[in-house]
Amino acid sequence: MNSSTNAVKRWWYIMPIVFITYSLAYLDRANFSFASAAGITEDLGITKGISSLLGALFFLGYFFFQIPGAIYAERRSVRKLIFICLILWGACASLTGMVNNIPALAAIRFILGVVEAAVMPAMLIYISNWFTKSERSRANTFLILGNPVTVLWMSVVSGYLIQAFGWREMFIIEGVPAIIWAFCWWVLVKDKPAQAKWLSEDEKAAL
């Protein structure tokens, strides 16, 4: 089996999935700044101190659950972990558009930090399962490009949604794609090459 053909096949199958998943995670994490400029602080009475607390709560959840998430992804299943996380962070993002008080918002931001904590380590583990050592640096670079690329398109989309509907609707609408994508992820993704039906036995053996 030609190794270059095998590599191209994996790149075109795996990396778009990885890119979309990480891009959606960044979208639901970063759109709070757009809402802040659109009036969420005034509507909910968020002071500068509370705004700092909300940011701290997100990263507190992110900090404490990143290692447990990585351990689960390594020992159990990246596929199952990201499937659950996609649904939960999409739900958290949409629920943000429905909150009417600061305690509820604080709880949602903390939970969002928890469920997004596993995304980066899980994606790195997933890439390591599917790419050789010589390929991983390029694959990881493509993954990280999800951040700046997402900023470009989310600025346009979020700006339009806020202008057309408002900050609440922006959160609700932007949370839905992650939930839908969770089921696409479940169908498309396998933890290891040996489980993939779209690879031949020779291609699996080459990995």
Residue locations for each model-derived region?
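MFS 12-TM fold signature
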Residues: 86-96, 112, 174-181
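Residue-level signature of mid-helix packing/kink "hotspots" within the transmembrane helices
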Residues: 30, 59-67, 117, 151-152
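Conserved MFS/SLC helix-loop-helix module at the cytosolic interface between two early adjacent transmembrane helices
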Residues: 64-103
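Cytoplasmic helix-loop-helix junction between adjacent transmembrane helices
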Residues: 108-145
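Cytosolic juxtamembrane N-terminal segment immediately preceding the first transmembrane helix
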Residues: 1-32, 42
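Helix-loop-helix hairpin linking two adjacent transmembrane segments in secondary transporters
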Residues: 143-188, 193-194
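Helix-breaking motifs and short loop linkers at transmembrane-helix boundaries and internal kinks
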Residues: 45, 77, 98-104, 115, ...
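Extracellular/periplasmic helix-loop-helix junction of adjacent transmembrane segments
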Residues: 33-65
